[in-house]
Amino acid sequence: MKYSGWPEPGELVVGKIDEIEDFGVFVDLDEYEGKRGLCHISEVASGWIKNVRDHVNEGQTVVAKVLDVDESAQQIDLSIKDVNDHQRKEKIQEWKNEQKADNWMELAFGEDLDDETYAAIANELLAEFGSMYDGFESAAIHGKDALEDVDLSEEEIDAIVQTARNNVSVPYVQVTGYVDLSCPESDGVDIIKEALQAAEGNGEVPDEIELEVTYVGSPEYRIQVQAPDYKTAEDALEESADRAAKVVEQHGGSGQFHRERSEDDE
């Protein structure tokens, strides 16, 4: 997405060097429509510079810091040397992510999507998530729930969610725990089965969570959870064990959650 306005002083921008002069370099700003900045030779690199071309090349993609903006003069002053390696890598990754989001918008709404509609949808995602990429990632994880506060139509939300789930690689974490279940009742086997169904959530586990319960060795069962972050995963793990324990305890049995396998099983 290219912005139609102007960058702010202090902002980091991505651009391509399209002209090199003795006094500095001109940079086409990739994120701003029709905007070009000037990086004076003193802002290209630290120290004395004999030849600008020893430091940059035409066509090179750079990250620069905006020093000053004069809209009346159509001038943007930039500094390449004021951007450290960490900032550069972070900004380039952010820029690449937004390029991906641009492609996802095209997949979701078609190549013929007009600029006005594109901007309206993009601005809703930006306002809610800070970037289009984060909006698509959240939709991939949480589905429609992620977009409930976004002012978009049902059709637009469905298109975003479907595209996100087909194209966004979501980072997941995995946690494992164990629960010991026992029940002295004559129908104890059936009660344990009921407890395991409860542990698995009875079909009510949120879409962003994958939960599996497997048998280790009586009375121990393994619970494995995959989720977008550790807090969500840990909460789901403990809730799963609690559900199972509650079922057997209601029938005079016992349930105990622990993080490591019992020594007798190893």
UniProtKB/Swiss-Prot annotation:
Domain S1 motif: 10-81
Highest classification ranks of the organism: Archaea, Methanobacteriati, Methanobacteriota, Stenosarchaea group, Halobacteria
Bias type Basic and acidic residues, positions: 240-249, 257-266
Protein's name in the database: Translation initiation factor 2 subunit alpha
Pfam family of the protein (one): EIF_2_alpha
Record keywords: Initiation factor, Protein biosynthesis, RNA-binding
Native species: Haloarcula marismortui (strain ATCC 43049 / DSM 3752 / JCM 8966 / VKM B-1809)
Subunit structure: Heterotrimer composed of an alpha, a beta and a gamma chain.
NCBIfam families, A to Z: PRK03987.1-4 (NF003064), PRK03987.1-5 (NF003065)
InterPro entries (UniProt xref): NA-bd_OB-fold (IPR012340), S1_domain (IPR003029), S1_IF2_alpha (IPR044126), TIF2_asu_arc (IPR022964), TIF2_asu_C (IPR024055), TIF2_asu_middle_sf (IPR024054), TIF_2_asu (IPR011488)
Similarity comment: Belongs to the eIF-2-alpha family.
GO molecular function, one term: translation initiation factor activity
Function comment: eIF-2 functions in the early steps of protein synthesis by forming a ternary complex with GTP and initiator tRNA.
Alphabetized PROSITE patterns for the sequence: S1 (PS50126)
PANTHER family: EUKARYOTIC TRANSLATION INITIATION FACTOR 2 SUBUNIT 1 (PTHR10602:SF0)
Name of the gene: eif2a
Residue ranges of the region described as Disordered: 233-266
